[in-house]
Amino acid sequence: MVELKVKTEMDVDRNLCNYCGACVGMCPTDAIWLDETVIKIHEEKCIECGFCIVGCPTGAITAEWFHGNL
């Protein structure tokens, strides 16, 4: 039997995000981009590497699947 991995949503806390773009530069699949003052995430392109979460200087990005292990 094959076990399928189900993606869960990522969240960007707009109260913490300072729109510095660090997460954009960290993403190896270009799944994150800055649209004026909104961080957007293309979840189908996301490979759940966690680089954006770890690279965010304000801790604004979270995901249910990320537990601090890279």
Swiss-Prot record:
<feature type="binding site">
    <location>
        <position position="49"/>
    </location>
    <ligand>
        <name>[4Fe-4S] cluster 2</name>
    </ligand>
</feature>
<dbReference type="GO" id="GO:0016491">
    <property type="term" value="F:oxidoreductase activity"/>
</dbReference>
<protein>
    <recommendedName>
        <fullName>Probable ferredoxin TA0517</fullName>
    </recommendedName>
</protein>
<keyword id="KW-0479">Metal-binding</keyword>
<feature type="binding site">
    <location>
        <position position="23"/>
    </location>
    <ligand>
        <name>[4Fe-4S] cluster 1</name>
    </ligand>
</feature>
<comment type="function">
    <text>Ferredoxins are iron-sulfur proteins that transfer electrons in a wide variety of metabolic reactions.</text>
</comment>
<keyword id="KW-0813">Transport</keyword>
<feature type="domain" description="4Fe-4S ferredoxin-type 1">
    <location>
        <begin position="8"/>
        <end position="36"/>
    </location>
</feature>
<dbReference type="InterPro" id="IPR050572">
    <property type="entry name" value="Fe-S_Ferredoxin"/>
</dbReference>
<feature type="binding site">
    <location>
        <position position="52"/>
    </location>
    <ligand>
        <name>[4Fe-4S] cluster 2</name>
    </ligand>
</feature>
<feature type="binding site">
    <location>
        <position position="27"/>
    </location>
    <ligand>
        <name>[4Fe-4S] cluster 2</name>
    </ligand>
</feature>
<feature type="binding site">
    <location>
        <position position="56"/>
    </location>
    <ligand>
        <name>[4Fe-4S] cluster 1</name>
    </ligand>
</feature>
<keyword id="KW-0004">4Fe-4S</keyword>
<dbReference type="InterPro" id="IPR017896">
    <property type="entry name" value="4Fe4S_Fe-S-bd"/>
</dbReference>
<feature type="binding site">
    <location>
        <position position="46"/>
    </location>
    <ligand>
        <name>[4Fe-4S] cluster 2</name>
    </ligand>
</feature>
<dbReference type="InterPro" id="IPR017900">
    <property type="entry name" value="4Fe4S_Fe_S_CS"/>
</dbReference>
<keyword id="KW-0249">Electron transport</keyword>
<dbReference type="GO" id="GO:0051539">
    <property type="term" value="F:4 iron, 4 sulfur cluster binding"/>
</dbReference>
<dbReference type="GO" id="GO:0046872">
    <property type="term" value="F:metal ion binding"/>
</dbReference>
<dbReference type="Pfam" id="PF00037">
    <property type="entry name" value="Fer4"/>
</dbReference>
<feature type="binding site">
    <location>
        <position position="17"/>
    </location>
    <ligand>
        <name>[4Fe-4S] cluster 1</name>
    </ligand>
</feature>
<keyword id="KW-0677">Repeat</keyword>
<keyword id="KW-0408">Iron</keyword>
<keyword id="KW-0411">Iron-sulfur</keyword>
<feature type="binding site">
    <location>
        <position position="20"/>
    </location>
    <ligand>
        <name>[4Fe-4S] cluster 1</name>
    </ligand>
</feature>
<feature type="domain" description="4Fe-4S ferredoxin-type 2">
    <location>
        <begin position="37"/>
        <end position="66"/>
    </location>
</feature>
